[in-house]
Amino acid sequence: MEVKKSSYNNREVATQKKGRRFVMILKFFLLGNPLSLCMKIINSVVIVGLYYGFMTTFSIGPSYLFLLRAWLMEEGTEKQISATTGFIMGQLIIFISIYYAPLHLALGKPHTMTVLVLPYLLFNFFWNNNKNFLDYRSTTRNSIRNFNIQCIFLNNFIFQLFNHFILPSSTLARLVNIYMFRCNNKMLFVTSTFIGWLIGHIFFIKCVGLVLFWIRQNHSIQSNKYLLSELRNSLARIFSILLFITCVYYLGRMPLPIITKKLKETSETEESEENEEESDIEITSEPKEQDEEEGSTEENLYFGYEEKEDLYKINETNKIPVNGKEKTKDEFHFKETYYKDSPVYEDSYLDRYQEQELWELESKEDKNLFWFEKPLVTFLFDCKRWNRPFRYIKNDRFENAVRNEMSQYFFYTCPSDGKQRISFTYPPSLSTFSEMIERKISLYTTEKLSHEDNYWVYTNEQKKHTLSNELINRIKTLEKKTGSLVLDVLEKRIRLCNDENEKECLPKMYDPFLNGPYRGKITKLDSRSIRDDLITSTDAEESIEIVWINKIHGLLPIPNDSPKKEFEYQKNLFDGEFLSTNSGHSSTSIGEVPLEYPPSLNLKKLSLLAEEKRMDSEKQAKCLQLIFDVVTTDYNDQTIRNQNNKLIFPGIEEIRKEVPRWSYKLTDDLEEQEEENEEESMEDHEIRSRKAKRVVIYTDKEETTNAISNTSDSDQAEEVALIRYSQQSDFRRDLIKGSMRAQRRKTVIWEMFQANVHSPLFLDQIDKTFFLSFDISEMMNLVFRGWVGRESEFKISDSEEEETKEREKNKEKKEENERITISETWDSIIFAQAIRGSMLVTQSILRKYIVLPSLIIAKNVGRMLLFQFPEWYEDLKDWNREMHVKCTYNGVQLSETEFPKDWLTDGIQIKILFPFRLKPWRKSKVRPHHRDTMKKKGKKNNFCFLTVWGREAELPFGSPRKQPSFFQPIWKELNNKIRKLEKTFSLSLVLRVSKKTRKWFLKISKEKTRWVNKIVLVIKRIMKELEKINPIFLFGFGKVKVYESNENRKDSIISNKTTDESTIRIRSTNWTKHSLIEKKVKDLADRTTTIRNQIEQITKDKKKIVVTPGISISPNKTNCADKNSELQKPIWQIFKRKSTRLIRKFYYFLKYFIERIYSDILLCTINSLRTNAQLFLESTKKMINKFFYHDETNQEGIDQTNQNTIHFISTMQKSLSNISNKNSNISCDLSSLSQAYVFYTLSQVQVNNKYYLRSVFQYHGTHLFLKDRIKDYCGTRGLFDYKPKHKKVDKSGINEWKNWLKSHYQYNLSQTQWSRLVPQKWRNRVNQRCTIQKKDSIILDSYKKNQLIHYVKQNDYGIDSWTGQKEKLKKNYKYDLLAHKYMNYEDGGDSYIYASPLQVNRDPKIPYNFNTQKTQKPESFYALVGIDISDYLGEESSLYGEKNLDRKYFDCRILRFCFRKNIDIDIWTNMHIGTKINKNTKAGTQNYQKWDNKDIYPLTIHQKTKPSTSNKRKKLFDWMGMNKERLYRPISNLESWFFPEFGLLYDAYKLKPWIIPIQFLLLNIHRNTNLSPNNNINGNQKKDLNLRSNKKEYLELENQNQQEKKQKLSQRDLGSDTQQDTQKQKKKEDGEKNYTESTIKKRRKKKQFKSKKEAELDFFLKKYFLFQLRWDDSLNQRMINNIKVYCLLLRLINLKEIAISSIQRGEMRLDVMLIQKDLSLTELIKRGIFIIEPVRLSIKWDEEFFIYQTLGISLVNKSKQQSETDRRYIQKYLDENPFDKSISRHSTMLVSEDKNYYDLFVPENILSTRRRRELRILICFNSWKGNVVDVDRNFIFFNENDIRNCGQFLKKDKHFNTDPNKNKLMKLKLFLWPNYRLEDLACMNRYWFDTNNGSRFSMSRIQMYPQFRIY
């Protein structure tokens, strides 16, 4: 019993424990963590599926129509149940298709659904509308076999299956597909989604049933049986209409396949040519016989997810059926080759040829079986149609438009980092290929390892160690002095050999073991003349050695941005005889070598700088013969012969990724009109451009003589036409005909006639929207009026004037809109223009020949009846002067007799010049002031436009103006006579009163004059005192601008000399209060000036009145006393009111005066004491630092150095010259601001404004460049993301490439574009630089610091800046500019990447770029341009045989300008431009401003000085043209980003363009070059624009002395003897002058040849520069007015009168006329009207540029010596002289002809290219474990000592450190490592991330270049 009891007790205890445990678990779930429980439930697949399924219930589609129709109409539950069942079954099939791929593909096939849906809809429509079509009546049979029930089921079932391409579903239904990517258990998710959808639809059906039940039970509805029966009878018709409308709406989103417009595709010949020109694959086709027999060509098809689309129009004959699908051969990655005779191809491709016959038979069978299928499918569903309404991005070059609708995303699993991951950029062809292989061969039969990830990492580690050990062993082998051959150390390249005995290998381009440059590299020469010289020459020494282009060539994108007509490829005819006789040339002498070397040639692999081995003559002949055999078989029937009987054929470009393109080129209306006279005119335009009409205004019928071919085209007249655009909004929006407009972004308009339609998305960016038509600033003024004070007191008197102007402007705008409305109404109605034109012509004839002669006769007859002389002669003369000029619809004058072209359809205007005015008499007796007003009216209104009703209007379609009445002068004259008679009676009374009034007035006026003079004297004295105290009062806080006389201004200038720049106080902390005080002071100062001017004017007027009291001013002899008494009253009232206001505001004036005295005197004293103390402390600190730390750079010392160590005399002089120049705007020298001032001011901005400074405060690089004190101050206040300070910051090697990549993103706008965004005040702002602050540093005259007196010109951003987003954007831009100039540079110097101010330590360091020697003057500087403008002007490889290598354009890669000691660049450019030189510009040059030739300055123009002239005073360069006397500024972004010396040359070029040869401007090689006369570039070719027509380019190429001078200057520098006599030089110049004149006429056909220079200039201007006139509204109107007058003047014989009258009335403006023959564009450029901007290009740099560029950045050289490496590098540059006959681009390649013996200093070169890349990638994978630095790593957070690079292998070897030359060479080779790394990055970016353009290359924010230490 006890045992049982105990067991019972134990069981009870266990039960209690379980219960307690369950309660604890329940408590944990319910109380402890309810949130996680809820999240788990919500995130479960079932709940999410139910939610998405329920949401799809609300996706109401057309399928609901059938369901509702069945429930409403059909009687009987069977039909309702069948409808519901079909509805649910269809949806179930849709959900299952999400999971089951074959079903999804079957439902998504566009062809099948197109064929099925359209007949079904047609059948259903007829069935519902025709009762006799089928028996629709209900039957008594209750069976499922009832046909009606089956049809109802099918209707609901099929409508659910309609795919989205025919009837797109709503967005909610697609949420299911979106979640599929997140969910793992897809089947459970699909099931729960369907259940959710079922629940929702059951709920919906129940709701519908309740509504129907309510309708049936409603007594009011049931009582009206007639209404119910009618509703029931019409329900079928209603649902049919609804269904039809729905289908039409959905089908409208994709156009009907039958109706849509077929676009004209390019022909096969064009396509094949273009494919060969741009092809990214190399096509080797059959010989001609096989091609004719079988007609097979390679296809290039893209298989998308939903449809197959041809990228190019190629014959679809060679399909390969694989598993029921048509696959092309190209998808198998095979190459078809038919060289069956060659032993190379027989064995390797034997299997291919055996299968070829089967493929051809099957393709023929396919063609016979399905001959009807292709046309039908293509007809119904054209894959090439432009269905989506994409914008057609025009490509003016030779390529087709890129298809951007095809997604590059393709999801597939691939191993990544050892794991199987989904890749969204997997190549589709590769996945298809792998699936095909898997079906046939089970490749993946190996078992998966359990630890796959670890295995992968371990494998990579092993590979890395193996490669590293192999590399180290090879290096150790080299170290052994056992005589081991270097070739044994080098890794051999593996080749695919065909026969071991014969040692014949595959060609390199077909060898799968070779990659990189050998797989697709083609070397081209651009100049036909060079190639001809090479081929015809027999001297082997004159042949050119061409070095392989680096791999970077193939990786960086090459823009094809030359016009199509410039591409003509030429090939010389070769025969075997020629090749056998000329044996001294290398194989790469011919430019169009499209293939690699043949297999029999054993060529050594070339390294980066090694020269190419020459082949012997036999092998060379074989190579060339093979090449040209291949070429001729490619193009047997497509070769085109030019005049020289040379074959023109396209070369094959380098391999790059193929981009899907459209198979046609589209043109718009304008292009069609431009090309209508040319050979290749399009039939019809396909792009719906803006509605426009081409109005011919002038036809040039003169004989145009062609200067080139000396043939005259007298019969071909050139038309000058204007394009008249419709004033309506452009709803066409460049849509392509046949595309779906409904899918374009919706646009709305809210005005009657709106110029541009906008999407509602951009309403907030528009100034005044339709619902917010008031100005926000007015509202802000009302809100903040309490802060400002009573604004009425400070109201400026000009406000009324401004309001009046605003009212007039609004009135004019309203009238203009009314005119536009009338104009568009006439233009839109059919036949309205013909009716209106006929009425106008009729009214013109009636007016001229009937109405006006009748009025003249009537008037003169009346005069004769009134016994007055008739005025026949005067009236008939005026009548004859009236001209009725026929104008175009928008008012361009033609002539009196010539009607516009197509005037009955396009419209006409009739303009009346000198309209006739019928006057009662000629010599009017009107009073003089009336006569003046009439004169003004006559000047303004001596023309009008005729209206339809015969009236006159000021403007076309304007309101008729009021005609001067004929009888009004008569009534006026009668009234005057009557008034005279009345005045004679009251004359005596008037005289008596006037005497008394005169006495009283004289007495009062004397007293007032005395009092006013005293006030004026007091005010003047106060102003002078203020000016003596502080001249900044002239400008106030940046707003007050008191206009002084010249004397006062001179006084202020003199007193300004004593002002120190440190007297500018920091603004007060209260931003708002301070801005309000400024506003008050500004208003007060304006009021003071206005009052003073008014008082002076009153005094002058009163003096006049007092001095001449007795003069009568009335023609009626009225006494002056009446007038004086009337004038006295308003003058006295005005003066009293103004003086009272002055007295009232005197308190504020006094308060401001005291405040200024306090701020200027006290703060000046305090600041000066503080500055002096600080300077003393800093100098002491410097001396201590110099004594103790002589060899180290002191970071803190640099940062804390105040920038007040500039020579005050030169600073004052610069500021004086700026102030004294009245024409200059006050510049904002932002570079003068200190960091403390900038960030203290920014910190005082209110909190609501700090949001817009986030880009400044949260810039991740900010803390690196700030001083510690400022950093701590701003960090504690939360301005920055405060981070711990890094004590040791890497100096000038920090992230240059990273920052450079960041700064050059796509929105890097030019200065011109910024100037269009910011106000006018900022357009002329000059970004001035600071000087290098050293006692022996260079002080440039134009870089001296201006005082902050110019900073006060900035806009006020107080309250007024809170008025809208645009103002905030401008403000943000300015703050960014401030922050940019102070953050994006480093303390070591001025990086050329950022044009930032310099701070140089006491130890003279090289600021990144250049190395010079202290002891001797360097030979030259090699300036590198790696900045923004180089993206626009860089040299691009020319592919065109017609262009020459001596093409003259700016090559920004090599900018080396070597001047003699006394050549001033400013004087030189002015000498070339022809502008005057202001001699006072250089007045500020003092003796203490000396050049330090030992020091380095960041500007790279170097003066070559003679030793004997070292003590002479040297001229200072005006680098950027900062002197205010030169008013023009660079329009593009040169002043802030470019090298200053090149900027000035560029400005000079823009003012008076000349063409500088590349040899002289950019490549001053230091040797004597004697150019042959044939290749001498003759002259400075200058541009002369003749604006006679808008098409004609009238470019004269004249020889000018300037170019000869330029050449000679350069040749002086080229000569070894720099002290040549100038007289000899002049004689030499005169002897070498060679004048050539040629003229370019209008554009000719494609095949017409131009002369060499004309073609070069034309090509240069078109390709590299963008010429445009800034057509703002004012200039546009003036130019159009001038054109209108020109059109009339061209047709007149005697045009003097019309021209003078047009100028007098302001209709023709002289300022926009081309008056002088030799046009200097200074004025147009200065005003910003004419703009020359470089075309944005992607540059294909050469490898030497990249190498030197990288070296300039990566190497941190701590000495001032120029390394041996640099000298040798430049010497190689100078020694290279491959030929002298022409100037080749290859002369700029820095490749030595000597053997390269130091290739192995980079140990990686021992390995092959593939192994090298593999090693790098493995190192990057495992970089966290080793010492090698990763490419992504930021070096700031690591210790400097841990930084290692590939030099770590060589540090241990003492042999390398013994020879200093070799050590330097090693350093040079070490920096080649980043070059390879950049190449790898480009490869990874392009092929791993699937980008097909190079613009995204800058998006990869990877620091590619680590810092390289110099030990």
From Swiss-Prot:
Residues 1603-1615, 1623-1635 have a biased composition (Basic and acidic residues). InterPro entries: TIC214. This is Protein TIC 214. It comes from Lemna minor. It is found in: Plastid, Chloroplast inner membrane. Its main location: plastid. Keywords: Chloroplast, Membrane, Plastid, Plastid inner membrane, Protein transport, Transmembrane, Transmembrane helix, Transport. Part of the Tic complex. Involved in protein precursor import into chloroplasts. May be part of an intermediate translocation complex acting as a protein-conducting channel at the inner envelope. Residues 265-299, 798-817, 1599-1647 are annotated as: Disordered. GO terms for biological process: protein transport. Residues 268-297 have a biased composition (Acidic residues). The keyword Disulfide bond does not apply. Belongs to the TIC214 family. Signal peptide: none annotated. It comes from the Eukaryota. It is a multi-pass membrane protein.
